[in-house]
């Protein structure tokens, strides 16, 4: 059985598509998967900055500040916030040494 079920033929009225076995479950499943793939790809292209920024930085809490003095913790928070405020278009990663 071939997955290529559509044949275009030239008629007097123009190009027509003659589909055979269009009720085949395999064809229906492949069509649904193809449509879902297209929708997900479009959403990915539209929202990739938001999605990847959220995955990369939103789910991480950053390095542990346990045992560090409160002044260093506050300084780290301010640096993180200023990096986000200054450059909202590009990803910014600040690592303290």
Curated annotation (Swiss-Prot):
User: According to its record, how does it sit in the membrane?
Assistant: Single-pass type III membrane protein
Q: Where is this region: Disordered?
A: 60-83
Residue ranges that the UniProt entry lists as topological domain Virion surface: 1-22
Subcellular location field = Virion membrane; Host apical cell membrane
Q: Which residues carry this modification: Phosphoserine?
A: 64, 82
Q: List the coiled-coil residues.
A: none
The way its activity is modulated is described as: The M2 protein from most influenza A strains is inhibited by amantadine and rimantadine, resulting in viral uncoating incapacity. Emergence of amantadine-resistant variants is usually rapid.
> Would you name any one GO CC term?
virion membrane
Q: Name one GO molecular function term.
A: monoatomic ion channel activity
Site (Seems to be involved in pH gating) at 41
Q: Which family does it belong to?
A: Belongs to the influenza viruses matrix protein M2 family.
**Domain commentary:** Cytoplasmic tail plays an important role in virion assembly and morphogenesis.
The name under which this protein is listed is Matrix protein 2
Its gene? M
């Amino acid at each position: 059985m071939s997955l290529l079920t559509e044949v275009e033929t030239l008629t007097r009225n123009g190009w027509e598509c003659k589909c055979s076995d269009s009720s085949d479950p395999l064809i229906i499943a492949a069509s649904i998967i193809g449509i879902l793939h297209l929708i997900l790809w479009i959403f990915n292209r539209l929202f990739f900055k938001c999605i990847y920024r959220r995955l990369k930085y939103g789910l991480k809490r950053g390095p542990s500040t346990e045992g560090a003095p409160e002044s260093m913790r506050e300084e780290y928070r301010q640096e993180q916030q200023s990096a986000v405020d200054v450059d909202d278009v590009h990803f910014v990663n600040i690592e303290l040494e």
